[in-house]
């Protein structure tokens, strides 16, 4: 590394006997970043990084992760503090605006979200076009994308107020659409939002109330879901967030952008892992079977995979998993299932064995956020096909914060990844008779 008069540090890259100086961009915390934006214009080369494992696509002030230390912070606040002391809409305000709200700001924000929770009545007809067996994520994906047809005034943006209104509308309407997707999938009538309830209470009300019976929200369940929403609100530049940013970089409307995020999140390697954990725990069946399945997980020739362990970023205990483990116990205790829930018993024993096993320690395979969340959802009465829908409901806040930040960033331009072409160099066309 070398430095020049302005105290900027440089990395040196040697290509074909020529040395190129690349500026090192300083992070406020965490890894610094080598600026390779001029490598192509100056060295006539691209960089190769499958999966973007070592590539920063943007500058961001929203979320910081230290995977080695197991740290997750939003705008500088530790995730555990936010989960234990805050509520979801306060965290939403923090992610979007950069600061925690004062009392007036919080009240104004929550009122705006409640005001926009209703969806256009014509959207109900869209739901009726799906067959009864449709996955709720498929319904949600289509419904969110269709919002652009109902709000053409927000297809182009010129003022900061437009960004804010769009974010609020999205945060407000996604839970309504999520609950509608569930109700339609089980053949029950839709339940309208109730502005007298707070955000989490209202979501539970729309999920479980019926026209003939009101749903009384259990405060322990409400508190648990509030924590789950906070823990899933944002997670830096993951697959779905990057998808939203890439779509947004083209100028696509925000409803379309969020629908692409939902599509990406639907992938089993991203948002569907907690459902896979439940299926795995059911397959294991009992605590006595755990050693057998641990051995299967170590066997390269066995198709069994230990779900809920390991993470693309965390090489330590996922801080979100630590919160959810205790939350899981609180929920099951409230529901009278703490001592007789077989899935929890298997999960706790599986974690204890894995954390002492050299195979998992060497590979830094620790429980992640998906390991306990599915057990909580199941205890709440939320079916597995809704797990990813709830993930998307919470992550919408992060998507909108990232989308807003992207539009306010003067460095951002339309995303255009490059490639290493390894195909045919040149071939002459032959007619079909000559082939």
Curated annotation (Swiss-Prot):
Pathway(s) it belongs to: Carbohydrate metabolism; tricarboxylic acid cycle; isocitrate from oxaloacetate: step 1/2
Catalysed reactions, semicolon-separated: oxaloacetate + acetyl-CoA + H2O = citrate + CoA + H(+)
Domain of life the protein comes from: Bacteria
One Pfam family in the UniProt entry: Citrate_synt
Keyword Transferase carried by entry: yes
PANTHER family in UniProt: CITRATE SYNTHASE (PTHR42871:SF1)
Name of the molecule in the record: Citrate synthase
Taxonomic classification: Bacteria, Pseudomonadati, Pseudomonadota, Alphaproteobacteria, Rickettsiales
């Amino acid at each position: 590394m070398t430095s020049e008069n302005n105290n900027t540090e440089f990395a040196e890259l040697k290509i074909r006997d020529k040395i190129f100086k690349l500026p090192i961009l300083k992070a406020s915390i965490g890894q610094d970043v080598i600026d390779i934006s001029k490598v192509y214009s100056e060295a006539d080369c691209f960089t190769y990084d499958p999966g973007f494992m070592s590539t920063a696509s943007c500058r961001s002030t929203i979320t910081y992760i230290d995977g080695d230390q197991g740290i997750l912070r939003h705008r500088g606040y530790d995730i555990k503090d936010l989960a234990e002391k805050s509520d979801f809409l306060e965290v939403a305000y923090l992610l979007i605006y950069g600061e925690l709200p004062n009392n007036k700001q919080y009240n104004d924000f929550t009122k705006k979200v409640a005001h926009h929770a209703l969806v256009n009545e014509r959207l109900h007809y869209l739901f009726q076009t799906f067959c009864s067996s449709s996955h709720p994520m498929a319904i949600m994906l289509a419904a969110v994308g269709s919002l652009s047809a109902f709000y053409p005034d927000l297809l182009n943006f010129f003022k900061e107020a437009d960004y804010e209104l769009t974010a609020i509308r999205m945060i407000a309407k996604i839970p309504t659409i999520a609950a509608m997707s569930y109700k339609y999938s089980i053949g029950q009538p839709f339940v309208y939002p109730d502005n007298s309830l707070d955000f989490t209470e209202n979501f539970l009300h729309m999920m479980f109330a019926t026209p003939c019976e009101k749903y009384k929200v259990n405060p322990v369940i409400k508190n648990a879901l509030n924590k789950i929403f906070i823990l899933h609100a944002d997670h830096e530049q993951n697959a779905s967030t990057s998808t939203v940013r890439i779509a947004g970089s083209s100028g696509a409307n925000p409803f379309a952008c969020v629908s692409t995020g939902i599509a990406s999140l639907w992938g089993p390697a991203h948002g569907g892992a907690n459902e896979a954990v439940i299926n795995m725990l059911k397959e294991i069946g009992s605590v006595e079977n755990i050693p057998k399945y641990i051995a299967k997980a170590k066997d390269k020739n066995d198709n069994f995979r230990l779900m809920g362990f390991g993470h693309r970023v965390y090489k330590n205990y996922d801080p979100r998993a630590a919160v959810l483990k205790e939350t899981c116990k609180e929920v099951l205790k409230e529901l009278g299932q703490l001592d007789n829930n077989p899935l929890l018993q298997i999960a706790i024993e599986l974690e204890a064995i894995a954390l002492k096993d050299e195979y998992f320690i060497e590979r830094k395979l620790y429980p992640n956020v998906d390991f306990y969340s599915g057990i909580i959802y199941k205890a709440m009465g939320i079916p597995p096909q809704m797990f990813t829908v709830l993930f998307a409901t919470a992550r919408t806040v992060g998507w909108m914060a990232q989308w807003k930040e992207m539009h306010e960033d003067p460095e951002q331009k339309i995303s255009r990844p490059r490639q290493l072409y390894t195909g045919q160099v040149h071939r002459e066309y032959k007619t079909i008779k000559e082939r």
